């Protein structure tokens, strides 16, 4: 049966998603929303997202590496200075017009910018706020200033021990030592679950009005 215009519309056609200075996990989560039709705006620092310049085997286009080209697909792009209050104001205006926020900045940083969940919810009660962090939003490590990275995600998950746990007696062979999983495994898994969580929250909001 041929689809009508309404039936062929992407599920998230009417959703807007600013993606605030995220790492690889944020890009993966936002990519899921974009694939479902959300208008997704990626916010980058003035010099560009550092992940633009990651190019294994020097594979890329016009100075942008293949991983970024893949995971930042289906986006609009804007540059903002996170250290400039004027940039905070622009991001806040974007956030207040959005349905979903995706960020990997620490809760303290977002609060200082006036873009934390509680602040935004006061003006936009139905907003879905996806905050991704290796250290979480609460607990003793939440405010750690160490830069978030895929290898930290993997190490804290315990995943590398599955790949290279030493076997038998004596010193381990190189291939038996705990080993980083290939690609951005930590970021991919975190981003996938984050994206699915945002979709679930949008569904809940649509069903309950909350």
What would you call each of these model-derived segments?
Residues 22, 83, 183-187:
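Alpha-helix N-cap/helix-initiation motif
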Residues 32-36, 97, 111-210:
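Active-site-adjacent "lid/gating" segments in soluble enzymes
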Residues 24, 47, 86, 108-110, ...:
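Glycine-rich nucleotide phosphate-binding loop and flanking beta-alpha elements
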Residues 9-48, 55:
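Conserved small-residue-rich beta-alpha loop and adjacent elements
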Residues 1-10:
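Basic/polar N-terminal segments that are highly enriched at the extreme N-terminus
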């Amino acid at each position: 049966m041929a689809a009508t215009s309404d039936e062929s519309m992407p599920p998230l056609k009417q959703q807007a998603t600013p993606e605030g200075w995220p790492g690889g996990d944020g890009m993966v989560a936002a990519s899921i929303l974009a694939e479902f039709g959300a208008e997704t705006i990626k916010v980058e620092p003035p010099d560009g997202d550092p992940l633009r310049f990651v190019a294994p085997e020097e594979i890329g286009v016009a100075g942008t590496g293949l991983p970024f080209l893949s995971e930042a697909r289906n986006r609009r792009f804007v540059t903002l200075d996170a250290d400039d209050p004027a940039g905070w104001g622009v991001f806040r205006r974007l956030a207040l017009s959005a349905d979903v926020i995706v960020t990997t900045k620490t809760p303290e940083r977002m609060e200082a910018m006036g873009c934390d969940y509680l602040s935004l919810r006061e003006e936009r009660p139905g907003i879905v706020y996806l905050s991704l962090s290796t250290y979480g939003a609460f607990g003793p490590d939440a405010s750690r200033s160490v830069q978030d990275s895929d290898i930290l995600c993997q190490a804290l998950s315990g995943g590398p021990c599955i790949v290279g746990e030493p076997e038998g007696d004596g010193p381990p062979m190189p291939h038996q030592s705990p080993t980083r999983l290939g690609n951005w495994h930590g970021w991919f898994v975190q981003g996938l679950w984050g994206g699915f969580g945002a979709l679930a929250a949008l569904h809940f909001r649509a069903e309950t009005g909350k």
